[in-house]
Regions:
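Short glycine-rich or small-residue beta-strand-to-loop segments that form or flank ligand, phosphate
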Residues: 82-88
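Acyl-thioester C-C bond-transforming condensing/cleaving domain
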Residues: 57, 64-79, 90-166
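Residue-level detector of alpha-helix boundaries and kinks
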Residues: 9, 48, 52, 86, ...
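Conserved active-site "lid/cap" helical segment
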Residues: 1-82
């Protein structure tokens, strides 16, 4: 459970802040949280670069698993995809996630690719819209939209802003 870690992290903060944060966590309705990091790792002193390296490794792994599973369900091969859209706003990757997927899954080298990044919560919907527009213009083509978000990778221990928490 994350609550003991949150309480420990908030030591020294004013009571109003503590109540607000605990209300946010307890009132979220989330019964189980999934993360690319153990809770101890989230609340450890580590740099953004260290957490981003974890993000790169884990996001790539999750994206590959997700895309493979979706393609299998659709009876498609990675080489059947004409346009790949990857969506993620919680880490920084160069090359971007789509490049890793293209190489790791041996997708077409001439595949059209679009990494959707730094758009916040609207990114997933934007990725779907971009895919729909591509299919409208190219009705016999196939699109894969892969979204990976891992907000625990962006949590910074010394930052008590609501942006860091939410």
């Amino acid at each position: 459970d994350i609550i003991p870690y949150v309480k420990n992290w908030m030591r020294g903060q004013d009571n109003r802040f503590k109540r607000k944060v605990l209300k946010l966590f307890k009132g979220s309705g989330v019964k189980r949280r999934y993360s690319i990091m153990d809770v101890e790792e989230v609340f450890s002193k580590s740099s953004f670069e260290e957490k981003n390296n974890i993000y790169i490794h884990e996001a790539t792994k999750l994206a590959e698993q997700s895309l493979k599973k979706s393609l299998k369900k659709a009876n498609l091969l990675p080489s059947d995809i004409d346009y790949i859209i990857t969506v993620s706003c919680t880490g920084f990757m160069i090359p971007s996630l789509d490049a890793y997927l293209i190489n790791n899954l041996q997708m077409k080298q001439d595949i059209v690719r679009l990494p959707v990044t730094e758009m916040g919560c609207v990114a997933g919907v934007s990725g779907i819209i971009y895919g729909k527009n591509f299919l409208n213009a190219n009705p016999n083509k196939r699109v894969a939209v892969v979204s990976v978000e891992a907000p625990t990778a962006t949590f910074q221990l010394d930052n008590f802003s609501m942006d860091n928490i939410a």
